[in-house]
């Protein structure tokens, strides 16, 4: 009799343990959307917004309201888009933030964040995080384009001299990055010519073979689009 009671208790304990595990797994799955992840974002990575601010953005959009919130510095930030895997924020009057939830494999997602500053020409910073907001090496998920990839290969000595001369005025490598809302692509626009005077900007632009590059998420990393 005592042995049967002990066995029943063990069965009850195992069922409760299984239920707790299932609930925990369910919560983890629910947290794999950008709204939940954004709210859980550490304050150290979110100097403009409190946790309440971050929750308000999503709640306002879900209620079909303008998601405009006064930030810690007394200015307004506005969330423009929010889906399960994409977020677009007008952080300040001169900066934006994008996030994209991307699959590394069937069970692991990471967050790609693109912060773009218009000062006055757009330039972006890309970072990657796991879903616990631990920063990950950028090189693990993308090899950023070299500046030279945007330029034509000179075919004559005169073209080489002209390119060398005009690039003296292009002393900053400025690159605007943008995540796609619906796809899993990352585009780069070469913005260096935009901060130069018109004459040198036109000269530099004539030496470019492209101003935009597209990368696609493939095999757990961003790679140049085929």
Where do the model's predicted regions map?
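Short consensus segments that form the blades of beta-propeller domains
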Residues: 89, 116-122, 201-206
């Amino acid at each position: 009799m005592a042995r049967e009671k002990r066995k029943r208790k063990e069965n009850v304990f195992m069922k409760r343990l299984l239920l707790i595990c299932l609930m925990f797994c369910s919560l983890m799955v629910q947290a794999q959307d950008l709204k939940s992840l954004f709210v859980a974002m550490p304050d150290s990575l979110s100097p403009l917004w409190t946790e309440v601010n971050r929750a308000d953005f999503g709640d306002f959009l879900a209620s079909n309201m303008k998601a405009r919130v006064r930030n810690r510095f007394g200015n307004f930030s506005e969330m423009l888009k929010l889906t399960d895997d994409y977020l677009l924020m007008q952080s300040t009057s001169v900066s934006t933030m994008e996030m994209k939830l991307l699959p590394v494999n069937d069970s692991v997602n990471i967050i790609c964040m693109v912060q773009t500053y218009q000062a006055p020409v757009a330039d972006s910073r890309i970072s990657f995080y796991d879903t616990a907001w631990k920063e990950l090496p950028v090189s693990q998920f993308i090899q950023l384009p070299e500046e030279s990839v945007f330029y034509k290969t000179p075919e004559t000595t005169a073209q080489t001299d002209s390119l060398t001369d005009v690039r003296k005025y292009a002393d900053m490598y400025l690159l605007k990055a943008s995540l796609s809302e619906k796809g899993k692509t990352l585009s780069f626009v070469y913005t260096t010519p935009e901060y130069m005077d018109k004459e040198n900007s036109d000269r530099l632009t004539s030496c470019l073979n492209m101003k935009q590059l597209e990368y696609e998420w493939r095999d757990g990393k961003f790679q140049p689009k085929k």
